[in-house]
Amino acid sequence: MISSLHRPTVARVDLEAIRANIDHIHQHIPKKVRTYAVVKANAYGHGAVAVSKAVEDQVDGYCVSNLDEALELRQAGIDKEILILGVILASELQLAIKHQLTITVASLEWLELAKKESVDFSQLHVHVKVDSGMGRIGVRSLAEANQLISILSDMGVQLDGIFTHFATADDSDHAMFDKQLTFFKQLVEQLDKRPALVHASNSATSLWHSETIFNAIRLGIVIYGLNPSGNSLSLPCPLKEALSLESRLVHVKQIQAGDSVGYGASYVAAEPEYVGTLPIGYADGWTRNMQGFKVLVEGEFCDIIGRVSMDQLTIRLPKAYPIGTKVTLIGQQGKQVITATDVADYRGTINYEVLCLLSDRIPREY
């Protein structure tokens, strides 16, 4: 998808805020812990290459979800370790080796496929994934983990780490978290051969369970300044939201009582009023169900009226503003603020999704 550089809708990313967030988190966690910045999904919508370069001196490596995301960083000149958290195709192992990427091995079945590939396994770097209760990928028993590690050793693979992922680290109820942690700790302690790196801490764990950190952490949503729990748990350290989303009025008019706005005529004016149109819609990640939510115009909240279209939306204005007036969809204007979490709460989702859905049509400015 082409970035729409000639349209007045832009996501502004404060790279200094991201750096400050990492500094604050580092002050909150134990020293001498290896730090991975999670920059998957285009750095949660913030721009993977720009973010990775901005924090290069603050982290030891990066986490991405797939091979293509890793290759994007390598092609941009990022030379630190890149850990691919998802499972890659065994047929793509040569690419991973060529670009010195660390891959995740999550099952014996996948390993049997990998063994058939004609590659130099001594150049392959691996972390083993343990499914301690998340239910997605990973080995599920000590026996399976030991067997996997034994085969990897026989193949001459560089076995660098072992890790798991918590399902409820951002929940006030710790029962599931404690169960997963106990399982993972016991498995690691009983391994026949323990890799050098052991990590289980994602953003939430690093904030609220820092006592459980092993010797590496994966920092995701927190470096972008968002609370992993939404508003459920209080943050133990200050964070600043790094992304703001802005557009501008491209059309302003007065409508009369009885006039409708948008597909399905879902909004009908009860009285004469001014309305304005913004060049942003659901193709940009501003979803159709945002009708009734608010944006900021000159520091005042204005309602989104009518259904959000693919490329445009309409807002009710208190007066006739000139074309080109700035409108804030996420961020601060004057004393008022709209956060990604506010948007998520309105949609009935999580702040992660709000940012990740912002499409490539929206240019990022730094």
Curated annotation (Swiss-Prot):
Sites where the protein binds substrate: 136, 310
Top-level taxon of the source organism: Bacteria
Isomerase found in the keyword field: yes
InterPro entries per the UniProt record, alphabetical: Ala_racemase, Ala_racemase/Decarboxylase_C, Ala_racemase_C, Ala_racemase_N, Ala_racemase_pyridoxalP-BS, PLP-binding_barrel
Keyword annotations of the record: Isomerase, Pyridoxal phosphate
GO molecular function: alanine racemase activity; pyridoxal phosphate binding
Cofactor: pyridoxal 5'-phosphate
GO terms, biological process: D-alanine biosynthetic process; peptidoglycan biosynthetic process
Matching SMART domains: Ala_racemase_C
Catalytic residue list: 40 (proton acceptor), 263 (proton acceptor)
Catalytic activities: L-alanine = D-alanine
SUPFAM superfamilies: Alanine racemase C-terminal domain-like (SSF50621), PLP-binding barrel (SSF51419)
Enzyme Commission numbers on file: 5.1.1.1
Pathway: Amino-acid biosynthesis; D-alanine biosynthesis; D-alanine from L-alanine: step 1/1
Pfam families referenced in this protein's UniProt entry, alphabetically: Ala_racemase_C, Ala_racemase_N
GO CC, any one term: cytosol
Residues with N6-(pyridoxal phosphate)lysine modification: 40
Broad EC category: isomerase
Cross-referenced PANTHER family: ALANINE RACEMASE (PTHR30511), ALANINE RACEMASE, CATABOLIC-RELATED (PTHR30511:SF0)
Sequence similarity: Belongs to the alanine racemase family.
Reported function: Catalyzes the interconversion of L-alanine and D-alanine. May also act on other amino acids.
Protein name, entry field: Alanine racemase
Lineage: Bacteria, Bacillati, Bacillota, Bacilli, Lactobacillales
Name of the gene this protein is made from: alr
